Curated annotation (Swiss-Prot):
Entry binding sites for GTP: 38-45, 63-67, 80-83, 160-163, 197-199
Function: Necessary for normal cell division and for the maintenance of normal septation.
Protein name per its UniProtKB record: Probable GTP-binding protein EngB
Source taxonomy: Archaea, Methanobacteriati, Methanobacteriota, Methanomada group, Methanococci
Gene: engB
Pfam family, one: MMR_HSR1
SUPFAM superfamilies per the UniProt record, alphabetical: P-loop containing nucleoside triphosphate hydrolases (SSF52540)
Length: 227
């Protein structure tokens, strides 16, 4: 990484850290938040663009999103967190700092976060898990899911890029994926509850995501209005 690129990454990282630390001070009107998390290049920015209908930078290279991006969608705030995993051009120690800041932001804002969406790539994910298993380590995707569950932040998993696997292999692959997240097969029993499948580049799966978001936001407002 050349000096100019390195300085730009450091600048973005400092902005990210400041936003994460300010957390509660930067909430828009104290509206409920929906966070979007996942590895780099799984379709996070595409999902954000579909929900917000705003021009969101979408890149083919991993690690396009390097800072927290918040979008006011009316009755809730959509928060696009940096992709974890491999990030183009970033040193490992910088990547680890960003991961810590993601966790810090979630912890600082847990009272406002009413739902969380973890995106995964249906074709790439099983191989990622196998590589981590070979090192006797838990993939960060699973750690994040368990972390969000522990905080009761209503995590759901969006399995993206369904067009990348053959139809004959879909049931077997999806059964394997839900089992990895601790949900017994068959995968269909979890559809539109914990699991949503789709092809975001074609907008497939967006309606199901919005149903979940609205359900979580409405429940938050119902409880809040009772107080």
């Amino acid at each position: 990484m050349n000096e100019e690129t390195n300085n730009e990454f450091k600048k973005n990282l400092e902005k990210f850290k400041k936003m994460a630390k300010r957390g509660k001070e930067t909430k828009m009107d104290k509206k409920p938040q929906i966070i979007v998390v996942g590895r780099s290049n799984v379709g996070k920015s595409t999902l954000v663009r579909l929900i917000t209908k705003k021009d969101v930078r979408v890149g083919k290279k991993p690690g396009v999103t390097l800072k927290i991006n918040k979008y006011d969608v009316g009755n809730f705030i959509l928060v696009d967190l940096p992709g974890f995993g491999f990030m183009t051009g970033l040193e490992e120690k910088v990547q680890n700092k960003i991961k810590k800041e993601i966790v810090q932001y979630i912890e600082d804002n847990k009272d406002q976060i009413v739902g969380s969406i973890i995106l995964i790539d249906v074709k790439a994910f099983p191989g990622i898990v196998e590589r981590w298993d070979s090192k006797d380590e838990i993939p960060i995707d699973i750690e994040m899911f368990e972390f969000l569950e522990e905080l009761e932040l209503n995590p759901s998993i969006f399995i993206n890029k369904m067009d990348k696997i053959k139809k004959n292999d879909q049931d077997k692959t999806l059964d394997k994926i839900v089992a990895i997240f601790g949900c017994p097969a068959p995968w269909r029993q979890w559809i539109n509850d914990i699991i949503t499948i789709g092809i975001l580049k074609e907008g497939i799966g967006l309606n199901e995501v919005m149903v979940k978001i609205n359900k979580n936001v409405n429940e938050y407002n119902r409880v809040k209005n009772k107080k």
